[in-house]
Design a protein with these regions (language model features):
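Nucleotide-sugar donor-binding and catalytic loop/hinge architecture
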Residues: 1, 168-185, 237
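N-terminal strand-loop element at the rim of the active site
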Residues: 6-13, 19-64
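A short, histidine- and acid-enriched strand-loop-helix "catalytic/donor-clamping" loop
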Residues: 12, 63, 92-94, 103-118, ...
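Carbohydrate-associated surface elements
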Residues: 39, 139, 160
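Short His-centered aromatic/hydrophobic patch
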Residues: 86-92
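Acidic anion/phosphate-binding donor-loop and adjacent secondary structure
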Residues: 114-115, 145, 160-177
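Conserved donor-binding/catalytic core segment of Leloir-type glycosyltransferases
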Residues: 178-196, 202-205, 218
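Nucleotide-activated donor-binding/catalytic signature segment of Leloir-type glycosyltransferases, i.e.
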Residues: 220, 230-240
Length: 240
């Protein structure tokens, strides 16, 4: 049995949520999987449709971490067939007390703290008790080595994707009409969060349009920055 401990899981939407969902679904094809995930308002409808067991943990962030770790530790004590624990973040494994194999995914931002800082020392202490580190890119692996994580523990596995679904012809025609005579073509697929920096691309687009009058930038997603992005696009007269 595999245990998956995650802070990012559907029905919440996002890149990490998709990654952990895909990983869990793939693992469930070959072995039993138990998931410990954060609470989400619409989790019941979602969780009823899956083939594996999910425990949801709510409450404020600090207490939620401790509660989840307690539940995982108790589950491992009672289930001798657990072979490993897989987590989306080093903090998800920080309080897990077990001799079972521990695997942690890394993505770069969460480990990017100055070497020797309090955060860095805390990270290294956590990774000293982790057996395998899975980096999402060579860049992330090199960053991990640079901040002090044992290189021998790290392997690189690029994020996977589900096989593409067949797209209906009307959607293809709509996309072709939208992109007709447009070049270069830029696209961002993400949540509309401040840290994604959509506004910087849009501001650069105004200058690029002087060089490439037929350039198009398509933003796909949703989020709290949506209205601000639309407002900036209008102000720069880029909303064709």
């Amino acid at each position: 049995m595999y245990i998956v401990v995650t802070r990012s899981f559907p029905p919440e939407v996002g890149g990490m949520q998709n990654l952990m969902w895909g990983l869990t679904c793939s693992l469930a094809k070959y072995n039993l999987v138990k998931v410990f995930a954060d609470f989400h308002e619409n989790y019941k409808e979602h969780d009823q449709k899956v083939s594996f067991s999910i425990d949801r943990v709510g409450g404020i962030k600090l207490l939620r971490k401790h509660r989840k770790s307690y539940l995982v530790n108790e589950f491992i004590k009672k289930n001798k067939n657990v072979s490993c624990v897989i987590a989306d973040h080093w903090k998800s494994l920080e309080l897990i007390k077990t001799t079972k194999k521990k695997i942690c995914l890394i993505h770069s931002k969460e480990i990017n703290h100055k070497k020797g800082s309090f955060a860095n020392r805390r990270i290294l202490k956590a990774f000293n008790n982790i057996d395998q580190v899975v980096a999402n890119s060579e860049y992330t692996k090199n960053l991990a080595v640079e901040i002090g994580i044992d290189e021998n523990k790290i392997i690189v596995i690029n994020p996977g994707v589900f096989p593409p679904k067949e797209i209906d012809k009307s959607s293809i025609n709509e996309a072709e009409n939208l992109l007709k005579n447009k070049n270069p073509r830029l696209i961002t697929v993400s949540r509309f969060d401040k840290r994604k920096n959509h506004e910087k691309v849009i501001m650069a687009l105004r200058n690029l349009k002087q060089i490439y009058p037929n350039i198009i930038y398509t933003c796909i997603g949703y989020g709290e920055e949506e209205e601000n992005i639309k407002k900036l696009t209008n102000e720069l007269e880029l909303n064709e």
